[in-house]
Amino acid sequence: MSEPVISVRGLVNRFGTQVVHDGVDLDVLPGEVLGIVGGSGTGKSVLLRTMLGLQRPAGGQVLIEGRDITRMSQVELLSVKRRYGVTFQHGALFSSLTVAENIQLPIREYFDASEQTLNALTELRLRMVGLPLDAADKLPSQLSGGMIKRAALARALALDPGLLFLDEPTAGLDPISAASFDELVRYLHRGLKLTVVMITHDLDTLLATCNRVAVLIDQKIVVDTLAGIMNHPHPWIQEYFHGPRARAAQASVSS
């Protein structure tokens, strides 16, 4: 078996006396799409921020390609960050920058690229995520919700990462736009051979895109294939995957 792209070992996160994660272990395998789910307050975003190196845990390790990012300096961490792309729940595009300028920002941070190269890379990324080329000169305020998600994805792909983090990628989208974004993620995952870590509450997205699922529950984590996790006896997992909304989602994916 290939070495994990990410290994989380004995992770502890707490805020004051509130323990969010208590000894969490998680491996992200090369080439998979791993979905992370959990109820409110289980620390999905905290786990993501810790894996991104944006938050230092109270204990444990986060190894990316064998290197523990929890003990890195900011300079060392910067070299790791160029290897992954990330989209946040609401896009997090800079409102005063055009779509092109947002996409070019990480490239400018790491490389001294010519304007011609920047424009060519911008056009390529726009095509990759299915945005029209005239979107390049628009501000985020001029875009629809679905276009903002795609522009954020284009920026996340700017440095050709092998690892992609998606935080609630379909949140706020109508069902048609969400299904279209799911298909885009599958297409990019296959075509670019990406490893994807996705936080989502959207069962349709989970069922349509993920190979494995990690459930944050009781300060721990349960990880399995979709089929395996759906048979887990924990009451929250059973309600999540077999409640009325879950049955409707499974029926829509099967049809």
Where are these regions (language model features)?
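The feature captures the beta-strand-to-loop junction immediately N-terminal to the Walker
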Residues: V37-G39
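Catalytic Walker B motif of ABC-type/P-loop ATPase nucleotide-binding domains
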Residues: L164-D167
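Conserved ABC ATPase signature
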Residues: L139-L143, M147
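Conserved catalytic motifs of ABC-family nucleotide-binding domains
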Residues: D160
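Conserved ABC ATPase "signature" region
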Residues: R67-D68, Q116-D134
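Helix-to-loop junction immediately C-terminal to a conserved catalytic motif
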Residues: L52
